[in-house]
Amino acid sequence: MEPRAGCRLPVRVEQVVNGALVVTVSCGERSFAGILLDCTKKSGLFGLSPSTLLPLADNSSAVSCHGQAPEEGTGEVMQLETGPLHPHHKDPEKDQPPKTAVSEPPPPLIPPVPAGNLPPFPPYFEGAPFPHPLWLRNTYQQWVPQPPPRTIKRTRRRLSRNRDPGRLILSTIRLRPRQVLCEKCKSTVSPQEASPSPLNTPKPRRRLGSGPDSEHRKPEEPEDSAVIATAAPRRSKREKREEDRVAGERVPRSPVIKISYSTPQGKGEVVKIPSRVHGSVEPFCPQQSLQNGSQDSEVSRDVEPRGGGDRPPSGSSASIPKLKLTRPVPPISDLPPPKIRLKPHRLGDGEHEPLYRAELVEELNGCPRGPLVSSPALFADGSSHGLEDLSSGSSGEDDDLKRFPQGKHGRDGLAFLVDCPGRRTDCTSESVCSTDSLDELKSSGSEVTSPDTGDLSSGDSASVPSSSADTRQTVPPLTVRLHTQSVSRCVTEDGRTVAVGDIVWGKIHGFPWWPARVLDISLGQKEDGEPSWQEAKVSWFGSPTTSFLSISKLSPFSEFFKLRFNRKKKGMYRKAITEAANATQHVAPEIRELLTQFEM
């Protein structure tokens, strides 16, 4: 009889394993073997979803067992009680077991545990082999034995034997300082580092009797003097003070004057006038005295200039230098440094070169410093005895120089006189005056302009008590003469012609290339008439400011547009570019020729 759906067949239980039955059934000449599962357990077989076994749970109540699992050799047959079976099918099954049973019975497993001690998930038991990893990933709601957790091997850092575990390891690599600038640029950008006496590291307190020898020995020391100083044994402050006082009494010296020329482009030169021993030059200024606030007795101060040893700038730079007289840090806190102001002085109706005289401001913060007596003598063109004329100009972004009315020769000039009066007896280090620009130095015929106040300070020097307070020596003023000539057209070194009214690109340090219009062109000349520089006064588009730039720093707007234009800039930059482009269209060649035809 062929098996069909709905028929009932007697089966033989071969083995019982944790609620699962291994059965065999013979149907005619064929034999079938399989596993029957306990449908009351909702977990089902490994890898099968429980939903496939739910329909069989309805008929589970009709299944009953007539006996326990038969041992080997017995022929008991389990049959279902849901209906009568045909007799010809029952007799052969009882008489002899089927010969077509499982050829290889499963390996003997551990004996089944009692019903009360069954594990919660029947298909697996303690000691079962681990499933395949793919099966392990595809199964979810079943209990699957997991391998023991692996130990992750971590390499620990070796700690130093002489170091505490709680302390961090500091790197022992010694890095060299970055050399951002070369020696020439370093002395130009920061001239304080190249000065004879160190201005960046002043002493916290300086007294009246400190000597100059230590200051003058410092330039001769090597660069690693700090390392040598730390290795040498330290001396007490009293010993140093006594040595400085003894050394200061030997050689009284005049102040060191330093003039630094710097431009926004980072180029410039430094002119240093070192100190000289007193008595080498005749006194220039009349007697002056200064009372010390902490002492009753007057102390005198002898100041002498350097005569013929002045050296001019090493060469004329491409950019127009800016006259900037820097000063060191004030030496003491009890007496602030005196102030100087510049006043114009007219020599006569026929003179076209105004002279400016630097004077000490009489009172500062309400306390008088002493009698203010300026030099009665003023330098004319050829009366600068022992002092060379220094050519200088201004090249700042915000410098708007006011031109003098031109004379018959078409030349503007400026003489800058600085008196260095005595303040204390210990003036050896440096005495420099500070002016940010030449804006206040140049005026348009005004008798007295607003004073440009600079600082005049001095460092450590010797204390030289004099027998009489009336005999004192002072330093002659420092004279700077500027001779400029205004033109309407000039030719650059590379052969380009720059005229008044041209639209050009200009560069200021810290800003991108910016469009500008040339307002005026000035030629700076030395005493012998040789031009030293060419500068142009330009007005920036999109900004009310004007600047003086070197002609070599300007480039035509239209020709260099693709090279100078920055597409990333927005806002005022784009507005300035638009204004410059519109202005370029209006500057026709005939207009340019009209502007330059009145060239002198």
From Swiss-Prot:
Expressed in the brown adipose tissue. Residues 81-115, 143-171, 186-350, 366-408, 426-477 are annotated as: Disordered. The modification Phosphoserine is found at S190, S210, S254, S457. Residues 381-395, 457-468 have a biased composition (Low complexity). GO terms for cellular component: nucleoplasm; nucleus. One of its GO terms (biological process) is positive regulation of transcription elongation by RNA polymerase II. It comes from Mus musculus (Mouse). Residues 500-560 form the PWWP domain. Residues 104-115, 328-339 have a biased composition (Pro residues). Residues 239-252, 298-309 have a biased composition (Basic and acidic residues). Keywords: Nucleus, Phosphoprotein, Transcription, Transcription regulation. Chromatin-binding protein that acts as an adapter between distinct nucleosome components (H3K36me3 or H2A.Z) and chromatin-modifying complexes, contributing to the regulation of the levels of histone acetylation at actively transcribed genes. Competes with CHD4 and MBD3 for interaction with MTA1 to form a NuRD subcomplex, preventing the formation of full NuRD complex (containing CHD4 and MBD3), leading to recruitment of HDACs to gene promoters resulting in turn in the deacetylation of nearby H3K27 and H2A.Z. It is found in: Nucleus. This is PWWP domain-containing protein 2B. InterPro entries: PWWP_dom (IPR000313). The gene is Pwwp2b. Its main location: nucleus. Residues 187-200, 286-297, 443-456 have a biased composition (Polar residues). Deubiquitinated by BRCC3; leading to its stabilization. Gene3D superfamilies: 2.30.30.140. Disulfide bonds: none annotated. GO terms for molecular function: NuRD complex binding. Residues 151-160 have a biased composition (Basic residues). Induction: Induced in response to cold.
